[in-house]
Each structure stands twice: as structure tokens, then as C-alpha cells.
Amino acid sequence: MKILIKNVDVIYTADSNRSIIKNGYIIIQDNKIKEINDMDNLVYQSNDFDDVISGKGKMALPGLVNAHTHSAMTLLRGFADDMPLHKWLQEKIWPFEKTLIPEDIYWGAKLAILEMIKTGTTTFADMYFEMGQVAKVVEEGGLRAVLSQGLIEANDGEEGLNRALKFCLEWNNRADGRILTMLAPHAPYTCSPDFFRRVVDLSQEYNLGIHTHIAETKEEFQQIREKYDCTPLQYLEKTGALKRPVLAAHCIYITEEDMDLMAQKPIGVAYNPQSNMKLGSGIAPVTRMLSKGIKVGIGTDGTSSNNNLDLIEEARSGSFLQKVNDLDSTALPVDTVLKMLTVNGAKILGFDKLGVLKEGYLADIILIGLNESTFYYPHYNNLSNLFYAGSGNDVTTVIVNGRVIMKDREVLTINEEEVYYKIEEIARRKL
């Protein structure tokens, strides 16, 4: 398949030089970007391509990467709000989740993937249960994902760990390489050191990364300190986890010493600002982490604690939160935010050649309308307008792995009406 995107008003490549191409084109050959340049250098004719997409009045970006979510938790959107994390989990979320059947997970994930496509996310990292159902939806829906079967030691134990490993081996590199897998011990407060060490051993043996929640609340920090005489991050080091690639969600309560350690280890952080605000958890020291060379991406967490999957909105909140926390208006500028949402996210999820619009890179591309919303006028700085005024609903076209999965706001891989019907059917059954 050969696709031409032509006459693009502005292309933000997100490369290391922060290159911008005005009135440009992108040629996609199979699943990779073959050529990217300004229109004056285009030597091909439209009939040389299987599909030609007009980029007039559009901005092109690399597809966005959601570094941490729980996709099927769309089923719990609006179910339990305005509660602290541990009470929220123990009294509302975990009891509800015990009632879910595999088919529920399938439809919850399908609603999430529909929402992600419609708001410009092309890759996401997911931790939940019944992940085989989520993998099926990813395969059908066309997105790229890193999937992990969440493990809580008291519920899962060795049997659950074996199931998680089986899932990882069955689905890793499936769907034309769009699916990767990780092992996922939920958190230090739900998994003992011995359990974490067992996960680390399997991670090493089968070359799998580790996805976990770390230092999300002050309560967790104090609990781990009292029980193990270390910080949650040091807990990972003591169990050997930091010898392996780790995707660490939250990292709010970390010390300077923790960050110095992280800078030397293969750990990436998923910053989830809206969930952290909504649950009253705290503010991750993102600018400090970035200054030390730690790779940080942006996640939404689940929709029950956010309550949407719009990464543009998430990025705006995340930028503003760092500015006010640091009392510094220059904290997390839009160029940094774009890097976090694209190439940083891709790297910490384990994808090479992703997150940059560059020849030879995977063709995950989104187009954003510049003339259909008041938010983009005047056109002084379209990237600034997107992150500080726009939303994911401004995305018009989504391409993943060289395949168009949304065109002119129409999702081509999922029946929207069927998804809405099934979700309402599940909700009625739960009431």
C-alpha cells in the first residue's frame, strides 16, 4: 500500500531538531514513512499512489502515545467519583471489577479504543485483567499497544503469574508487530518483595518489560517506608526490578536520591496529571525528572479517575500543573509536551522507530484540522493553539502502521453504534 498525504499546511516532525515543514507532503510505503519533504520536492503524480489524502488546512503530527491506562475501565466512567485512591479502590472499583466477565472487558476496551482513535492516540500501554480480550480489540481496531495482565498477589499468586506469562508469550509481537507485552505487578503495596523478584526472574528469562504503579500516594510512600525501610522506588531496586526495562506509572512521591537512581536505570515514567489531580494524589516532579535525563511520557490512567482519554487535554493539564507547581511559566513548554506525547512515550513503551515523522520510521500519523475551530485562529503558533486551546476532537485523520483507521472523523475499523449499544447494555445489567 502506497499513500500520499499532500499539501499539508504544517508538519511537526518531533525529531531531535524540532523540524517543521510548511506546505509539505508525506509518502507512506506499506507501514513506514518513505519520504517527507516540502511540496516543491514532490516528483510523483497522484496516480502513483493507492490513496491520496489532502492535508490542506491540516497539521500533521506523529500519532500520540498514551503511556499508561486501563482501557476497559471505560465501564466505570462516572461510577465512583470524588474519593481518595485507596478508599476508591477498596470500596468501589475492586468490588465492581469482580462482577465483570470477559465479554464486558472486550466491549469496555472497544469503547476506549474508539475514544482513543477519535482523539488522536495511536499507541497505548494498558494494564488490566482478561487482557486477551483487549488484545483482540487492538488487533481488530488497528491501534498499537503494550498490554499487561495486572497482578495483585493476594488475588493472583503464582497461578495468576503463570497466566500473565502465557498471555505475554501468546501475544507479544502479534498483529503485525503492533502488540507488545509486559509483566505487570500492580504495585509495591499489593505485591511482596518475593513476588516482585519472581516477576523479575521471568522478565529476565523471557525478555519482557515490567509495568507497575509506583509512589502514587503519600499513604503508599509511608506504608512502604514503615514496612521495608525504603522508598517505593528503592523497593524496585531492592527486588531487582530496575535491572529490567520498567514502565513506572505516577512517581509522585520520589526523592532526589530516587531520581538520581532512576537516571541510571532503564526506567520510563508515565505522568498522569488529571488522574493524580482528581484523586488528590499529588503532583509528580516532572521537570526535575526531565532535567536529570529521565524519560517521561504522558498517560491518562483509567477513565474512572480522569474521566476521558483525550491526550491533548491531558497534556494541557500536565503542562499547567508543572508551571504552577514550579512557579515557572516556562515549565513544560509545548515542544517538550509534544516530545513526551510522541517519541518519549514510544521509547518507554519499547517501540523503536516510532514517534517521529521521519523516513524509515513507522507510519503512525495524525492530521488535525486548523480551519474548523475558533481555537486555531490566528495561526501564529499552531502547536501552541493545539495544546493550550484545542482538543483531541480536532483530529480528523488517523493512520497507524500505514493503515488509515479514521478519515474525516469517520472511524473505519469499529462500528460506533454497536459499541454504544453494548456498553449501555452492560451498564443496565450492573445497576
Curated annotation (Swiss-Prot):
Its cofactor is Zn(2+). It is an enzyme of class 3 (hydrolase). One of its GO terms (molecular function) is metal ion binding. Its EC number is 3.5.4.28, 3.5.4.31. The keyword ATP-binding does not apply. Binds 1 zinc ion per subunit. InterPro entries: Amidohydro-rel (IPR006680), Deaminase_MtaD/DadD (IPR023512), Metal-dep_hydrolase_composite (IPR011059), Metal_Hydrolase (IPR032466), MTA/SAH_deaminase (IPR050287). Transmembrane segments: none annotated. Zn(2+) binds at H68, H70, H213, D301. Substrate binds at E97, H186, E216, D301. Gene3D superfamilies: Metal-dependent hydrolases, Urease, subunit C, domain 1. Keywords: Hydrolase, Metal-binding, Zinc. HAMAP family: MTA_SAH_deamin. PANTHER family: AMIDOHYDROLASE-RELATED DOMAIN-CONTAINING PROTEIN (PTHR43794:SF11), AMINOHYDROLASE SSNA-RELATED (PTHR43794). Catalyzes the deamination of 5-methylthioadenosine and S-adenosyl-L-homocysteine into 5-methylthioinosine and S-inosyl-L-homocysteine, respectively. Is also able to deaminate adenosine. Belongs to the metallo-dependent hydrolases superfamily. MTA/SAH deaminase family. This is 5-methylthioadenosine/S-adenosylhomocysteine deaminase.
